[in-house]
């Protein structure tokens, strides 16, 4: 929603390149891996089979998605891609779509570079920027790095509001590399 909110200020150049990621869920008995398995797909991407309790999760896809939807669809092509990629590496699993217990998908708000490169080629690093009116925004990043992203936003807010006081924010690990 970063581009939508920033667009409320008027002239705003989109910074995001949206990517849809899909996961499939199987009963662990259908894909009884003991540890996370990294698989290379036919198009040189990487997907994972992750065991957790009675389930094994397979994912994720990484495809351009033109708009930000709260519940992005899981397409038949997504399912076929993940199933065929997994069967290529683990043919003994014999996974089929009728064995899927659940699916989910989400949107990655990657920071685009204007080059038109595929989403799989874009950096997952977050960026923090400030609009002319002072709106602080963050885009990109990974869910697993949410604490580091939050720290950058808090530090940027803190330093911007206390220009004269250069004390570090309590608990902060960094003093440099801030968004100003």
Language model regions located:
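C-terminal catalytic lobe of FAD-dependent flavoproteins
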Residues: 2-57, 63-180
């Amino acid at each position: 929603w970063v581009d939508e909110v920033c667009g409320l200020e008027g002239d705003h150049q989109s910074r995001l390149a949206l990517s849809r990621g899909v996961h499939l869920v199987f009963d662990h008995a259908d894909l009884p891996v003991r540890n996370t398995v990294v698989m290379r797909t036919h198009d040189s991407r990487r997907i994972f089979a992750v065991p957790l309790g009675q389930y094994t999760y397979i994912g994720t896809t990484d495809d351009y998605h033109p708009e930000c939807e709260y519940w992005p669809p899981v397409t038949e092509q997504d399912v076929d891609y993940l199933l065929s990629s997994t069967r290529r590496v683990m043919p003994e699993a014999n996974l089929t779509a009728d064995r899927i217990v659940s699916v989910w998908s989400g949107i990655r708000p990657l920071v685009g570079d204007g080059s038109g490169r595929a989403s799989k080629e874009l950096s997952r690093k977050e960026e923090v920027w400030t609009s002319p009116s002072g709106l602080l925004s963050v885009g990109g990043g990974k869910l697993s790095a949410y604490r580091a992203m939050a720290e950058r936003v808090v530090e940027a807010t803190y330093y911007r509001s206390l220009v004269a006081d250069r004390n570090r924010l309590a608990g902060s690990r960094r003093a440099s590399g801030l968004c100003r």
